[in-house]
């Protein structure tokens, strides 16, 4: 026995087994009415249970074979499904006019029968069957990515078809609740996916508008979820007149081993024939042997080479340890391209002038392609950032989905109990600028982390916009590790990272959610969306009166610095745009915290309370300071006897009057208040503190 064959044991079936599944088909003399009622039941959110596959297959047989069971039984579709373990059980009831009449009278169908009794169906058009099947096909291209991506893609296609005047779908079909129902059905129904794909590929005549939509959707579904197959075949296993040659970058021995394993996996995939490009959608056997993680170096090199050729396939992550390999492959491929172009130009050009013209053209072409690639990637990055923000803002989306589903469902489906959605804490290896994903995160896209804004990305770096995992956000996001360590003895509070909301109840809920506290303890400060009073604008009197409030929980640390490049004119929302903030970025906060001390009515001014008004001596380094019993903000006495309100005075978009006066008077070369105000936003919080404490 070859000992090395041990490595391959268990990768191939030795006793193949196919699980038998029974599918019920319905046969009546009023097939169109039955099919329309099946569509109505699905649209109403009724769970057909084990009758769902049979109902969907009944729709397909009616649409493609006009309910001719003999034609269907001799078709390639029926043969493939039988080989896959499906057995067809036909229920005949010639006089039945309602879907209710053909359902077997068995106890476990009782809830379904009760639900269908309340369903009123007035539609009896045959074209509605094709309309429904074409609508289902719109979800195929992004089916393996996730619900949001699939629904967005379907809506874009609906818009295109409506503009072209091909077909118009009912408005209630385009609601989020209904589209999620269809997505779930398509995700779970192998028969519907298979029939749509088979007919989309093989239907060559008799097309109507619905069939053309199905064919178009199936064409877009090719190699969905098989990006590594497409990139390796196009860029690594290069097909030439003399045969298949390996790309120069993968000719080293270790990568060659991965290429050999990949070829073996491809040969297994090819056994599925015309269904191989749809293997991920149909979940065919052998698909698990084509994951990126099984071929890390090959995958990284293939994606780097593809990007160098102008491909915008940037949504795929490679392992963090192989990210540099991807960048190196990109750079090497760009140089190889230039070298090949130079050699071709030398052979083609007849004189020096023509050679210069051709070289200049190819150089411009390369630059244009590169800039266009970066532009597309920038759009993808912004879209991903918006998507992540939407996930955070709609953290109870499941409850909203249930409500929207109830709008299209009948009264018997109304369920007043809300759905609880918890925030999953994930292992944190690095700071991220996105809020934590919710439980129903998009399967493939939610792993592709993004920075909070593409404005922090170096556009000269071709991978700055590619790498969903690898962005270094040191300028825009930072865990309070180095700077906050200077505040010795100040306990880190999970409350400091909580979102601020208009509802006090939501504040309490977020501050008491242990999972979210655990996650946010290590994450950067998420942006504040509402123009509301923050935890830090609460006056000290209120904090003393309510020692158990979440305001006191949130003031264990001084608030993170808040300053922008623009002067603040009024207390409306404005973004916090400094990228040098050691505490991380924070969003909009009520303007009261930025008011100077001279305003006696400012809520942030300390009340007439001895505990809050006592002068507290601070050393410039804050090394021995502990504030376990104190409330923020506080009066601080500097070295030279001046007082200012810490940290409020250091958070303003312009310097407080006391510091301006001191700096103008005491500097050897006095600066004007206007000049100081212009420089103030660019100073870090540490620099502001140092200036203030030495005045």
UniProtKB/Swiss-Prot annotation:
Report biased composition (Polar residues) as residue ranges: 494-505, 537-552
Compositionally biased spans, kind Basic and acidic residues: 438-447
Q: Spell out the subcellular localization from the entry.
A: Virion; Host cytoplasm
Record keyword Endoplasmic reticulum present: no
Instruction: Give the keywords, sorted.
Output: Capsid protein, Coiled coil, Helical capsid protein, Host cytoplasm, Host-virus interaction, Phosphoprotein, Ribonucleoprotein, RNA-binding, Viral budding, Viral budding via the host ESCRT complexes, Viral nucleoprotein, Viral release from host cell, Virion
Any Gene Ontology biological process? viral RNA genome packaging
Pfam families membership? Ebola_NP (PF05505)
Query: PTM details?
Result: Phosphorylated.
The molecular function terms of the Gene Ontology recorded here are: RNA binding
GO CC terms for this protein?
helical viral capsid; host cell cytoplasm; ribonucleoprotein complex; viral nucleocapsid
Spans annotated as Disordered: 424-458, 483-615
Sequence motif: PTAP/PSAP motif, positions? 603-606
Coiled-coil region: 316-341, 372-399
Principal subcellular localization: virion
Note on domains (UniProt): This protein can be divided into a hydrophobic N-terminal half, and a hydrophilic and highly acidic C-terminal half.
- Membership in a protein family: Belongs to the filoviruses nucleoprotein family.
Question: Which purpose does this protein serve, as stated in its record?
Answer: Encapsidates the genome, protecting it from nucleases. The encapsidated genomic RNA is termed the nucleocapsid and serves as template for transcription and replication. During replication, encapsidation by NP is coupled to RNA synthesis and all replicative products are resistant to nucleases.
Subunit = Homooligomer. Homomultimerizes to form the nucleocapsid. Binds to viral genomic RNA. Interacts with VP35 and VP30 to form the nucleocapsid. Also interacts with VP24 and VP40.
Q: In its UniProt entry, what is this protein called?
A: Nucleoprotein
Species this chain originates from: Lake Victoria marburgvirus (strain Ozolin-75)
UniProt gene name:
NP
């Amino acid at each position: 026995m070859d000992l090395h064959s041990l490595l391959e044991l268990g990768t191939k079936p030795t006793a193949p087994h196919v699980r038998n599944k029974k599918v019920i088909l319905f046969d009546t003399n009023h097939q169109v009415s039955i099919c329309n009622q099946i569509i109505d039941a699905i649209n109403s959110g009724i769970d057909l249970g084990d009758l769902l596959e049979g109902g969907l297959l009944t729709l397909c047989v009616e649409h493609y074979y006009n309910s001719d069971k003999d034609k269907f039984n001799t078709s390639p579709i029926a043969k493939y499904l039988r080989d896959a373990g499906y057995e067809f059980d036909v229920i005949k009831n010639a006089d039945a006019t309602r879907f209710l009449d053909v359902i077997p009278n068995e106890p476990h169908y009782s809830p379904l029968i009760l639900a269908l009794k309340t369903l009123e169906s007035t539609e009896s058009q045959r074209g509605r069957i094709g309309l429904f099947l074409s609508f289902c096909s719109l979800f195929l291209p992004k089916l393996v990515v996730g619900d949001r991506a699939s629904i967005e893609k379907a809506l874009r296609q609906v818009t295109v078809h409506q503009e072209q005047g091909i077909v118009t779908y009912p408005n209630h079909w385009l609601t989020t609740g209904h589209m999620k129902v269809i997505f779930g059905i398509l995700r779970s129904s192998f028969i519907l996916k298979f029939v749509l794909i088979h007919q989309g590929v093989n239907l060559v005549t008799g097309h109507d508008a619905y069939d053309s939509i199905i064919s178009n959707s199936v064409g877009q579904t090719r190699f969905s979820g098989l990006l590594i197959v497409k990139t390796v075949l196009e860029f690594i296993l290069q097909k030439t007149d003399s045969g298949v040659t390996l790309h120069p970058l993968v000719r080293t021995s270790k990568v060659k081993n991965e290429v050999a394993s990949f070829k073996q996996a491809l040969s297994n995939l090819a056994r599925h024939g015309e269904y191989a490009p749809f293997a991920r959608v149909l979940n065919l056997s052998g698909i698990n042997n084509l994951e990126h993680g099984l071929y890390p170096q090959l995958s990284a090199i293939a994606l780097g080479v593809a990007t160098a050729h102008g491909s915008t396939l940037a949504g795929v992550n490679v392992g963090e340890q192989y990210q540099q390999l991807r960048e190196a492959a990109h750079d090497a491929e760009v140089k190889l391209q230039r070298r090949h172009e130079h050699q071709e130009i030398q052979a083609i050009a007849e004189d020096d002038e023509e050679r210069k013209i051709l070289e200049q053209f190819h150089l411009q072409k390369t630059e244009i392609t590169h800039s266009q690639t970066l532009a597309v990637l920038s759009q993808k990055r912004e879209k991903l950032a918006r998507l992540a923000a939407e996930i955070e803002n709609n953290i109870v989306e499941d409850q909203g989905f249930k409500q929207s589903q109830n709008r299209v469902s009948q009264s018997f489906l109304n369920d007043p109990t809300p759905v609880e959605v918890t925030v999953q804490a994930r292992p944190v290896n690095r700071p991220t600028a996105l809020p934590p994903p919710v439980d129903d995160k998009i399967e493939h896209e939610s792993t592709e982390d993004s920075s909070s804004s593409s404005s922090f990305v170096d556009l000269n770096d071709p991978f700055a916009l590619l790498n969903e995992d690898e962005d270094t956000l040191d300028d825009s996001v930072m865990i309070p590790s180095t700077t906050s360590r200077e505040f010795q003895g100040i306990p880190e509070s999970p409350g400091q990272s909580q979102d601020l909301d208009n509802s006090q109840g939501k504040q309490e809920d977020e501050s008491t959610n242990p999972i979210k506290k655990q996650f946010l303890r290590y994450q950067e400060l998420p942006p504040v969306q509402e123009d509301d009073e923050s935890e830090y604008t609460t006056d000290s009197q209120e904090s003393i009166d309510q020692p158990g409030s979440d305001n006191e929980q949130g003031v264990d640390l001084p608030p993170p610095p808040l300053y922008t490049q623009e002067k603040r004119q009024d207390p409306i929302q404005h973004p916090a745009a400094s990228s040098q903030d050691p505490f991380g970025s924070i969003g909009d906060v009520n303007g009261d915290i930025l008011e100077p001390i001279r305003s006696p009515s400012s809520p942030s001014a300390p009340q007439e309370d001895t505990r809050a008004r006592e002068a507290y001596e601070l050393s410039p380094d804050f090394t021995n300071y502990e504030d376990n019993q104190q409330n923020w903000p506080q009066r601080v006495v500097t070295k030279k006897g001046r007082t200012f309100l810490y940290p409020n005075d250091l958070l303003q978009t312009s310097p407080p009057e006391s510091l301006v006066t001191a700096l103008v008077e005491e500097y050897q070369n006095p600066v004007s208040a206007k000049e100081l105000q212009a420089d103030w936003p660019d100073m870090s919080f540490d620099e502001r503190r140092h200036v203030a404490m030495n005045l």
